[in-house]
Amino acid sequence: MNGTPRAQIPDGSKNQYAMMKKAIAILCTCMIIAGCGRKQPALRTVGERFTNDVVLKTTPVKDQGHSDMCWAYAMLATMETEHLMQGDSVNLSADYVARKFIEEQASRLFITRRGTVSLRGMAPMLIHLIGIYGLDHYDAFHTDSTTDYHVVCRKVQEMAKGGLSLRQFDNRLSALLDRDIHTCIPRVYMLGAVYTPLEFAHSVCRDNEYQAFTSFTHHPFGQPFILEVPDNRFSDAFMNVPIDSLVSIIVRNIRHGHPVCWEGDISEPGFAFQSGVATLDDNPGGDVQDERQREFENHLTTDDHCMEIVGLAHDSKGQPFFIIKNSWGTDNPYHGFMYVSVDYVKMKTICIVAHTGL
């Protein structure tokens, strides 16, 4: 199309109809329990051609494997790019965060005998968790993508209800997590320096460095509110802004060298990781703000997945796209990255987390 080679990402009633459309989309994309850990089959051919306008630096694409940790992978990737764009180099461990979050939930479950152990969450949770438990770098603390965190969580749940003493439980829990995830050490060694995990986390993410945004009309714009989605387990508040303002925040950050963490719905048939493209098959005919609110209230837009926005691009027709780094490995035409249309982001965004420096 116009002789442009396909861009490669550098390494580094109406409601009834909508419900029917969503049901078909779910069946077609085989979306099941795993949520953000589910890889979908390609639903479109790879024929789109893109021109990259802005591409930020990134660490290598990771694979979250059998886990619901997309929120941790995406938020850590955002922090990694932030440092790379400043000339620093960090590659951060989602598995460290997973272990600490499992330990926290396991201790609570042992005492209360209530609840479950789960790794579902939202991007702001990552900031809270590393502020409490610290962080390690990827080379020192990671498991392979075959580790099934759903199985690990079930083992921990059974152990917590097994009639052990607290000391026995702590010892057995540590042994289980050492074996199934990775052994924790009290020091982080990085580029000749030695940190505690908390010191390392504070060097990576400063207090108030990021702000979370959303865009829904059941709360007033210009004010924060606690977003009513099941995975908002820490009851985080998100600044509510019009959707056009939210997209402008993304574009402005990317143009100034800051990545953005994106969270939203991926159950539309136009979202296809294996072809590396996400578009809306049916663009809303009315006001986007009203349409996205209607889909949210009817549970047609849900909190499915989290990824890192790292660039701006356009297709052969001049339509704008965001370049997004996923955490499902590199098995697609863009080596694990995707081109996601701005229209898709406008319609299907649940929230973003962006740098506060602008």
Per-region residue spans from a language model:
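Active-site nucleophile-adjacent alpha helix/oxyanion-hole segment immediately C-terminal to the catalytic cysteine
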Residues: 46-195, 208, 213-218, 251-256, ...
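Sec-dependent signal peptide recognition
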Residues: 21-26
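C-terminal motif of bacterial Sec signal peptides marking the signal peptidase cleavage site
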Residues: 34-35
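Short, low-complexity, disordered segments immediately C-terminal to signal peptides
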Residues: 39-47
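Active-site signature of cysteine proteases
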Residues: 39-40, 54, 59, 174-358
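N-terminal amphipathic/basic-hydrophobic helices that include classical n-h-c signal peptides
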Residues: 1-19
